[in-house]
């Protein structure tokens, strides 16, 4: 299934599912992608794949009709972060992220860099606390707050800077929706369908639990990419989410 590269031709999906592509081999990744339907999910490209295969790989996914979450977690001086975010927008991605711990000036510069793109600008999301982090990990960094409290502090700063939302754990989603409102988007990794292995994520939920918690976009990796029938797995997840809505 191959569509043209223009953003207007990309398949529209109402699914909250974002499939994390974690492949060492480009052909393996594209082989997987060709088995699934862009109406059933969006795709996340992270640091490893982007470093290996570059912007052209993102374009190949877009040509197949998929919206792309470019998960590079920019964290740099304000000017550099702003230019990086603008480059992602030039690439036509659907979503891009920065680290909230980069501070207010960095996040504000990143947001301002997207103003010239108008309605074609990607969603700009900030990372709060990585889902693999526990209280002991934060303590090692000199942070005495709990992961939940630290994530909320960073989320408040993110909203103050005018970004579209945050990456957070599903456990934080209920409170974040109450505190920051329905328009503030919540993107959550560590989502595993019932019966899946937890992998390296520590704070996990099922898709149905995440939806009930207020998560807007849920990132799912190996339960889909390692499925014998990924297309059917996606359809089953989406059907379950529709029943839960």
Curated annotation (Swiss-Prot):
CDD domains: OMP_decarboxylase_like. Coiled coil: none annotated. GO terms for cellular component: cytosol. Catalyzes the decarboxylation of orotidine 5'-monophosphate (OMP) to uridine 5'-monophosphate (UMP). Substrate binds at residues 22, 44, 71-80, 131, 192, 201, 221-222. Homodimer. This is Orotidine 5'-phosphate decarboxylase. HAMAP family: OMPdecase_type1_B. Pathway: Pyrimidine metabolism; UMP biosynthesis via de novo pathway; UMP from orotate: step 2/2. Its EC number is 4.1.1.23. One of its GO terms (molecular function) is orotidine-5'-phosphate decarboxylase activity. PANTHER family: OROTIDINE 5'-PHOSPHATE DECARBOXYLASE (PTHR32119:SF2). It catalyses: orotidine 5'-phosphate + H(+) = UMP + CO2. Belongs to the OMP decarboxylase family. Type 1 subfamily. The active site is at 73 (proton donor). Keywords: Decarboxylase, Lyase, Pyrimidine biosynthesis.
